[in-house]
Amino acid sequence: MKVYKYFIIALVIILFDQTSKLLVHKYMYIHDEIYVLGDWFRLHYLLNPGMAFGIRWNSEFGKLALTIFRIGAMFGIAYYLVKMVKKGTHNGFLICMSLILGGAVGNVIDSTFYGVFLNNAPIDPVPPTKWFHGQVIDMLYFPIFQFEWPQWVPMVGGNYFEFFSPVFNIADSSIFIGVMIILFFQHRFFKETEKMELANNQDAASEEMKITSFDTEANYSSEQNVISTEGESEKKPSDTNSSDL
């Protein structure tokens, strides 16, 4: 696949992510819930000032640092993707990197612009500027099962447990899926890449040997021609002298 096709995959992720966030922002209030699959899957509107899956970074300049880091990571991932495509890396790995890139860009858009255009910058602490301080919109909530730990269980007895409690978005899930597939199939991805590199190196070595062999034959042929020419030149004077006699 060409480089642009992997960026198209990332663009599709970005479009789905941003569309879902803007629809939730327009038609739902914060903390509203819509039950999709019983109690197992709900749309739950949350604003996340921090990282993926609701992880927060409570600091006046923490959000700015996080946004700058995300922007740097976004460009780094894009550069790495282009480099891996040119290197001929396994297609599955490149698709995973496209998913990660799409998710990274999706959350960068929230962090960079939503504070201004959706006016959702956090108010505690008050940011120095709304730019780069937008809160990420999360809405996917999968509380698959819940229970209360028995009192006799050490450390957690009597505590409420819910799986899966974090609320996230399409960008988060795209990054997570891309990373997990790479972790599970990295041996296959990089093994085939090494085979391709070895085959390319062997082909290059074979071509170099052919060129070297051709040059050697050409040099040998030219040397033979020079020797033959010199031999003919040596014979001509003797022929002339014999005719004079």
Language model: regions and residue ranges:
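Alpha-helical transmembrane bundles and membrane-interface segments of multipass inner-membrane proteins
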Residues: M1-L245
